[in-house]
A protein has these predicted regions:
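Glycine-rich phosphate/ribose-binding loops and adjacent secondary-structure elements
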Residues: 1-22, 150-151, 229-355
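Conserved, well-structured core domains of diverse proteins
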Residues: 1-213
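Amphipathic, alpha-helical segments enriched in basic
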Residues: 61, 96, 101-104, 108, ...
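Conserved alpha/beta-domain cores
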Residues: 120, 131, 142-144, 166-172, ...
Length: 355
């Protein structure tokens, strides 16, 4: 059951009948435009439309805050898509002294570019993101699949392409002790927002010699990540893995990536008791994560629901101060960040937008 109601059984029945009628009506030659997975004019509404992407890119390349504001307004003016689009801010009765606000350098530490692997992007894009995040003091995540050890060494100009966060997924591709030792945080990925409860698959044609080398596998052979971690079937198992990872790199925080879902608060409480330092609540509206089309369209829950539940349950159980709450999944503007912060998030992942 959903905490925000929904269309209900009657609504589902109405939709099915409407589709059935469309399928069998006579003398109709017009096919639906579509645009479910890729933007098409007059098709389904997408938040990232071409003009808005171009506007954001222009704002970044020209360092223009005014252009960014036009982009943010363009996102805000779209049809209501997310739960946060239904919310608005109350004007405070009293302003906050700017001295009480964190400095820009401190604020940047709260941001990251999301978990995207070398295999999902490319070596160039993956390294560029890491360098950019390191330059501003934010964090990039390696994603699943390892990272070239050459990146652990700083470049001659002082830049670092080493991802501050290293991810461990169910298949453990690319995970070595050297990999774990060259990071500030280790992230255990339990699931992904775009396909909760499902595993992953990297098709054979994408497994180049470079990817195979990093993942310690064979070029051209499809790589499967199972839905569960086969050494985690309880909170006690998770606690053991967290303990082991902290022994491998005592200086690193250990985070657990969860997906927004009904009951995620209870899971978050267990994760906090397992001595995790960070809990990430991932929403459904970010990147596709190479998900099946049915999952992209029909699966997942907004981070607004998962984040608020996790924050409340952790607080009620006296565990909130033990962990840092992070969220990601379709964060596009400063407004999204502020709403996430008001719902309990302390750190924020911005993946698609950073690309």
């Amino acid at each position: 059951t959903s905490r925000i109601s929904g269309i209900g059984i009657a609504g589902i029945e109405k939709k099915i009948k409407k589709l059935h009628k469309k399928a069998f009506q006579k003398n109709v030659l017009i096919l639906p435009i579509g645009g479910i997975y890729k933007y098409r004019k007059n098709g389904e509404t997408h938040q990232y439309q071409g003009n808005l992407i171009h506007m954001l890119q222009s704002a970044v390349s020209s360092n223009s805050y005014n252009t960014y504001k036009k982009y943010a307004q363009g996102i805000y003016d779209l049809d209501i898509i997310n739960l946060r689009d239904l919310l608005d801010f109350k004007k405070p009765k009293q302003s906050i002294d700017i001295k009480e606000v964190e400095s820009v350098d401190e604020l940047r530490k709260r941001f990251g570019s999301g978990s995207m692997s070398h295999g999902a992007l490319s070596a160039e894009a993956h390294e560029t993101l890491a360098i950019a995040m390191n330059r501003i003091g934010a964090a990039s995540c390696s994603g699943e699949g390892g990272e070239d050890s050459n990146r652990f060494i700083k470049k001659k100009n002082g830049d670092s392409s080493n991802s501050k966060i290293k991810q461990i997924a169910s298949a453990r591709f690319g995970v070595t002790i050297e990999y774990l030792n060259n990071c500030d945080e280790i992230e255990i990925k339990i699931s992904q927002g775009a396909k909760p409860g499902e595993g992953g698959q990297l098709p054979g044609f994408k497994v180049s010699s470079e990817i195979a080398r990093l993942r310690h596998s064979t070029p051209g052979v499809t790589l499967i990540s199972p839905p569960p971690h086969h050494d985690i079937y309880s909170i006690e198992d998770l606690a053991q893995l967290i303990y082991d990872l902290k022994q491998s790199n005592p200086k690193a925080r250990v985070g657990v990536k969860l997906v927004a879902s009904s009951g995620v608060g209870t899971i978050a409480a267990g994760v906090a008791k397992a001595k995790a330092d960070v809990i990430l609540i991932s929403g459904h509206s970010g990147g596709t994560a190479a998900s099946p089309q049915t999952s992209v369209k029909y699966v997942g829950v907004p981070w607004e629901m998962g984040l608020t539940e996790a924050n409340q349950i952790l607080t009620l159980n006296g565990l909130r101060h033990h962990v840092t709450l992070r969220t990601d999944g379709g964060i596009k503007t400063g407004r999204d960040v502020v709403i996430a912060a008001m719902m309990g998030a302390e750190e924020f992942g911005i993946g698609t937008t950073s690309l």
